[in-house]
């Protein structure tokens, strides 16, 4: 996808005025398993799951999927807002290292024992980095359509996304009390970004009401719309850092933590170079292909949920087999131990 150079030029003038914090306190939603017919299926996940959204997403981006997965796997699912997203505080730096630090801190602070991670796009890269840097904290990961590589080719897309959000708030003139604010905001986005599915994904950031938890980005004039992300301050950091990957820091780092990679068939993210990069860092990875674009979770929710459910079931079967083998080996050791002889001592 190609966007005009004017969009990139406008974005480069973004000012930075957000505070710097080592750890952001992550807002989250918790989805607990509910009674359903899924209970009759053999899908179980012994550990809780944390879901990580994509860029300009938030904790409710795929909320119906979270509940389905929680029911299917009989495990709680935490869906978090990353820093500067949803209801989590606005702060810098916006780098993968900072996001991974926030995630580790969230796991430790909430005493979540060895969770598995499911990450989409930006969240997929974050999941891989967290597992590589802190493998002792995580059980496994599901990586939705991304790979551990630098991706400068996506910078024009990210530029267009940022400009679409910014123009819909600061240049559209649409008022929050306008009953047609949704359609008007979407029309503004279309003039800046030609990716219609992405625009629908981005639109949830535009709101007619402020938040009680954090300061939303808005025009100073009365009755203007709000944006959940601090778009003017954050845009340049997104374009610079989201395509990145800390290759130098992770040179030679490899883990046996298992991951499933969900490849969207037409997105081009999981290519040959990406598969080679996966093999450098993960000794136990599986790739499953689902028909669709990068937004495959929106386009084919049941297919990806089924693929994730099957993979967790297979992982649990492996764990059960390993435990059975270990128990059998231990029992054999016990039976092979010599019986201690003793002499009867008579007391006069």
UniProtKB/Swiss-Prot annotation:
Organelle transit peptide: 1-19
Major subcellular location class: mitochondrion
Catalytic activity: ethanol + acetyl-CoA = ethyl acetate + CoA; acetyl-CoA + H2O = acetate + CoA + H(+); ethyl acetate + H2O = ethanol + acetate + H(+)
EC number: 2.3.1.268, 3.1.2.1, 3.1.1.-
Active site (record annotation): 121, 145, 294
GO cellular component terms, semicolon-separated: mitochondrion
Keyword match Glycoprotein: no
InterPro entries to which the protein is assigned, alphabetical: AB_hydrolase_1, AB_hydrolase_fold
AB hydrolase-1 domain mapped to chain residues: 49-305
UniProt keyword annotation of Repeat present: no
Keyword annotations of the record: Hydrolase, Mitochondrion, Transferase, Transit peptide
Subcellular location: Mitochondrion
Molecular-function GO term, any one: acetyl-CoA hydrolase activity
Function as written in the Swiss-Prot or TrEMBL entry: Alcohol acetyltransferase that catalyzes the synthesis of ethyl acetate from ethanol and acetyl-CoA. Can also function as a thioesterase by hydrolyzing acetyl-CoA in the absence of ethanol, as well as esterase hydrolyzing ethyl acetate.
Family membership: Belongs to the AB hydrolase superfamily.
Protein name: Ethanol acetyltransferase 2
Organism: Hanseniaspora uvarum (Yeast)
Taxonomic classification: Eukaryota, Fungi, Dikarya, Ascomycota, Saccharomycotina
Encoding gene (name): EAT2
């Amino acid at each position: 996808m190609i966007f005009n150079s004017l969009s990139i030029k406008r974005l480069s003038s973004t000012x930075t005025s957000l505070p710097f914090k080592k750890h952001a306190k992550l807002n989250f939603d918790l989805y607990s398993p509910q009674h359903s017919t899924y209970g009759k299926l053999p899908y179980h996940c012994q550990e809780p799951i944390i879901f990580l959204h994509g860029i300009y997403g938030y904790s409710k981006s795929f909320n119906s999927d979270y509940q389905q997965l929680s029911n299917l796997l009989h495990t709680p699912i935490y869906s978090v807002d990353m820093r500067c997203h949803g209801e989590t505080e606005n702060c810098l730096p916006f780098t993968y290292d900072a996001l991974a630090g926030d995630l580790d801190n969230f796991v430790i602070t909430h005493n979540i024992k060895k969770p598995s991670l499911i990450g989409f796009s930006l969240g997929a890269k974050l999941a891989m980095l967290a597992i590589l840097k802190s493998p002792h904290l995580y059980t496994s990961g599901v990586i939705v359509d991304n790979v551990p590589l630098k991706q400068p080719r996506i910078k024009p897309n990210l530029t267009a996304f940022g400009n679409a959000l910014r123009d819909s708030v600061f240049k559209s003139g649409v008022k929050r009390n306008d009953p047609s604010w949704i359609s008007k905001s979407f029309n503004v986005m279309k003039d800046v970004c030609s990716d219609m599915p992405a625009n629908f994904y981005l639109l949830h950031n535009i709101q007619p009401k402020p938040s009680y938890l954090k300061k939303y980005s808005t025009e100073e004039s009365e009755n203007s719309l709000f944006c959940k992300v601090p778009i003017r301050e954050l845009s340049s950091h997104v374009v610079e850092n989201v395509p990145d990957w800390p290759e130098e820091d992770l040179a030679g780092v490899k883990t046996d933590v298992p991951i499933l990679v969900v490849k969207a068939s037409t997105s081009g993210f999981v290519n040959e170079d990406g598969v080679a990069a996966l093999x450098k860092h993960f000794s136990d990875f599986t790739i499953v292909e689902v028909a669709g674009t990068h937004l495959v979770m929106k386009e084919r929710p049941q297919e990806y949920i089924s693929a994730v459910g099957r993979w967790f079931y297979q992982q649990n079967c492996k764990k059960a087999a390993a435990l059975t083998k270990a128990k059998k080996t231990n029992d054999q050791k016990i039976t092979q131990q010599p019986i201690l002889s003793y002499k009867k001592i008579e007391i006069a």
